[in-house]
């Protein structure tokens, strides 16, 4: 087979057109997490996110600074947990499963983000999923309201 200038240009154009799609497919969703440096469950949740293909950066924050960060970013007090993430403009509060974060990013609702209030046993980073308690992941509205985004039954 003879490689002509025309076929070389056509091939080059095909690769150039496909390059942005290939780069996008390899990009990991980036989440920045504010957490108490002494909290082991936060580190366990971060490890789960990394294992699920998220690029995670962390920042240590204590007490009132972490509470202020949550308030400044629209997390209602009744939705609070031990760590707060920010991904593509959405807030992620507490032990939210990676699948729910991906669903949020795919659906792109007009909302502040997701929250798992408290620290339910068996949620990601809080013990074995096979022994989990029932819990809900909430979608936090821009007006501070919340609704169930996903319900997880007890195992």
How would you name each of these model-derived features?
Residues 29-44:
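Local sequence-structure signature of Cys/Sec-based thiol-disulfide redox active-site neighborhoods
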Residues 34-36, 61, 95, 117:
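Active-site-proximal beta-strand/loop segments in catalytic clefts of secreted hydrolases
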